[in-house]
């Protein structure tokens, strides 16, 4: 953005075209009028002349309170930002020889994360000689897949990287 350029629509003296399509402060179309005449009308009411559609021929301008317009635009932008849900990836770490109760606790945590709309990365770590029994890890992740199949879909199938096996699940849409 160049230094003389500002954000937002052009207003008042920044509108440099000779004629404009005017919409008054009550929202009624006044037709094509000269820019000077429109500026005088806006000044009489104590409001601003703001360019709404700059690419039209002639440009469409409206008589409004510029401060109020900017405030409403900021509120709209804040509202849309607030509505956007940031999806987090939560991680659950397991070992191949996990106990029944521990498995249940991890499963409850996964259910909670999925219900909140988060993705879950399930990491199965192998230590030492456990690498010789990777089939146990595959069985465990397959069991996990079946247990969460009603509430989640598999985003990435179990895959082995170095000494750990990973799988990512996401909420069903």
UniProtKB/Swiss-Prot annotation:
It is found in: Cytoplasm. Gene3D superfamilies: Translation initiation factor 3 (IF-3), C-terminal domain, Translation initiation factor 3 (IF-3), N-terminal domain. InterPro entries: T_IF-3_C_sf, T_IF-3_N_sf, Translation_initiation_fac_3, Translation_initiation_fac_3_C, Translation_initiation_fac_3_N. The keyword Mitochondrion does not apply. Transmembrane segments: none annotated. Monomer. Belongs to the IF-3 family. This is Translation initiation factor IF-3.
């Amino acid at each position: 953005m160049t230094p003389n350029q500002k954000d937002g629509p052009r207003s008042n003296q920044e509108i440099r075209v000779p004629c404009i399509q005017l919409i008054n402060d009550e929202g009624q179309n006044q037709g094509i009028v000269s820019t000077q005449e429109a500026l005088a009308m806006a000044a009489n009411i104590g409001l601003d002349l703001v360019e709404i559609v700059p690419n039209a021929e002639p440009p469409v301008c409206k008589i409004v309170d510029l401060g109020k317009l900017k405030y409403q635009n900021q509120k709209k932008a804040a509202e849309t930002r607030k509505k956007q849900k940031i999806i987090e990836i939560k991680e659950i770490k397991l070992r191949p020889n996990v106990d029944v109760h521990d498995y249940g606790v991890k499963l409850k945590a996964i259910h909670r994360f999925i219900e909140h709309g988060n993705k879950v990365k399930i990491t199965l770590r192998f230590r030492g000689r456990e690498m010789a029994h990777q089939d146990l890890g595959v069985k465990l992740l397959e069991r996990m897949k079946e247990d969460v199949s009603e509430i989640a879909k598999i985003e990435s199938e179990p895959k082995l990287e170095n000494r750990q096996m990973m799988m990512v699940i996401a909420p069903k849409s």
